[in-house]
């Protein structure tokens, strides 16, 4: 192995530490471990499985939207929530979120929002901490993460969240309700990450395949709320993983709220010289 190859490997490992540290900072750290379709619906909900598998395409048709995210998990007997907000372009598969970690247990240090840039196969983070200068970005290859970055970054990429539904195996239409004042159809079901990976677009195949093998189970229960155009307005996934400290799987609930479709999205990826290449501290 050449010196340059060793340096690239060291940088990838350091970036993975930085990403994993988001969950560690909230009290958890993710680590990898190692049918037939059933359709339930009615004349109002239609073919639930087919409808849900088309939801990602409906977002591409919409072009873009604003997004709010939340990730809930139990840490040391206390439930904590990581929140985020931003915009996403479903055609370019790029977005930007401001992610806020919960306050530290002592309640003394105020946490600065972490800026995350989402791109195919990559996650960029600024204000990450862990010894990274405030004006530098950390780049993470999401294909190297055992969870496919479904939870490690503290927020699920909105388009990846939608493509999880490509793996829908069972689904039930539960009726109409409202999300943020919009009439929606509520579906509840289970998706398989392996199935989702096989049907996903090129940028999500690798991450979803990694998640299928990295979570405690590849089956993901969900609640999805679709508007009359078939676009996701709200989706809640329940992931399960082993974090290396707990004997039993840790449950993480990731919720994504989408609104203001057609919103302007401008994402500029960092220049090479703005990406941190030094050592990243473990938390």
Please give the residue ranges for each predicted region:
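Subset-of-secretome marker
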Residues: 2-10, 26-29, 33-283
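Sec-dependent N-terminal signal peptides
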Residues: 11-23
């Amino acid at each position: 192995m050449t010196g340059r190859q060793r340096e690239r490997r060291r940088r990838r490992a350091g970036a993975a530490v930085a990403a994993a540290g988001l969950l560690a900072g909230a009290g958890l750290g993710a680590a990898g471990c190692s049918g037939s379709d059933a359709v339930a619906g009615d004349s109002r909900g239609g073919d639930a499985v087919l409808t849900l598998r088309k939801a990602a395409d409906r977002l591409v048709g919409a072009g873009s939207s604003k997004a709010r995210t939340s990730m809930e998990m139990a840490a040391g007997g206390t439930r904590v929530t990581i929140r985020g907000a931003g915009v996403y372009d479903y055609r370019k598969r790029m977005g930007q979120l401001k992610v806020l970690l919960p306050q530290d247990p002592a309640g003394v240090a105020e946490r600065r929002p972490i800026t995350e840039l989402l791109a195919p196969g990559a996650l960029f983070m600024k204000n990450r901490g862990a010894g990274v200068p405030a004006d530098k970005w950390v780049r993470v290859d999401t294909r190297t993460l055992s969870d496919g970055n479904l939870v490690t970054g503290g927020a699920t990429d909105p388009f990846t969240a939608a493509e999880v539904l490509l793996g829908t195996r069972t689904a039930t239409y539960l009726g109409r309700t409202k999300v943020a004042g919009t009439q929606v159809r509520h579906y509840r079901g289970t998706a398989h990450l392996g199935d989702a990976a096989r049907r996903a677009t090129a940028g999500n195949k690798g991450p979803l395949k990694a998640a299928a093998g990295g979570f405690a189970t590849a089956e993901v229960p969900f609640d999805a709320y679709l508007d009359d155009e078939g676009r996701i307005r709200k989706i809640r996934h329940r992931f399960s993983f082993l974090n290396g400290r707990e004997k039993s799987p840790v449950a993480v609930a990731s919720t994504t709220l989408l609104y203001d479709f057609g919103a302007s999205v401008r994402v500029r990826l960092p220049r090479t010289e703005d990406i941190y290449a030094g050592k990243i501290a473990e938390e």
